[in-house]
Amino acid sequence: MSRPTKFRKVDFFPKSTCFIPLGKPKCEVEEIALKIEELEAIRLKDIKELNQEECAAKMEVSRQTFQNIIDSARKKIAIALTEGNAIAIGGGNFKSKFCKFKCLDCRNTYEINCENDKHMCPSCGSNNIVCNKKTGSCENLCK
């Protein structure tokens, strides 16, 4: 029996999640799925220029796991660029300090940094809130 996949910590979510080669309709191109944690690995290593140990620590994984993640990401990006495929960013096994909350009193849904922000509804001020994602990433508020 294989070990369960450990959630990888991610601090960045892209505004754009689909990239299509110029001049090709989306329906005519093959789509490559790039996981959120793969994009985070690329961001930390290639943009932030952190070393492998720092990247692994930020994502809360081993150095070997980080290397596996970034190798997978780079291969997918290389295939998409050389073969003219679209890249769709989403999914994966990750956790984040950002979480969607729902107020049980006024039904407002909102997103906050669950590590730093106050756990009260910005609309009505109620503390009667729950995590709307139920992923465990905000720990005690996920029900």
Swiss-Prot record:
User: InterPro entries, from UniProt?
Assistant: UPF0251 (IPR002852)
| Pfam families according to UniProt | DUF134 (PF02001)
Among HAMAP family, the record links this protein to:
UPF0251
The text of the family note is: Belongs to the UPF0251 family.
Q: What is the name listed in the Swiss-Prot or TrEMBL entry for this protein?
A: UPF0251 protein CA_C3166
Q: Which organism is it from?
A: Clostridium acetobutylicum (strain ATCC 824 / DSM 792 / JCM 1419 / IAM 19013 / LMG 5710 / NBRC 13948 / NRRL B-527 / VKM B-1787 / 2291 / W)
